[in-house]
């Protein structure tokens, strides 16, 4: 199935397909893959991160569906 993957800030250099940048990229993944499994597959499991699917916070055990947009951010702090 196909999803969109968007990596932000320093994580954008870790796209599994072609280059870096802020634009979401299409990505073929196995049916029923979870957020956590995909994060591990693309080598970000050890990174501290915040994940969103279709604009909502997503736990690692959430299964992805065709057309979902997975966005991964590094931790953000400010004041």
Where are these regions (language model features)?
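Ubiquitin-like/PB1-type beta-grasp interaction modules and other compact soluble beta-rich domains
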Residues: 1-78
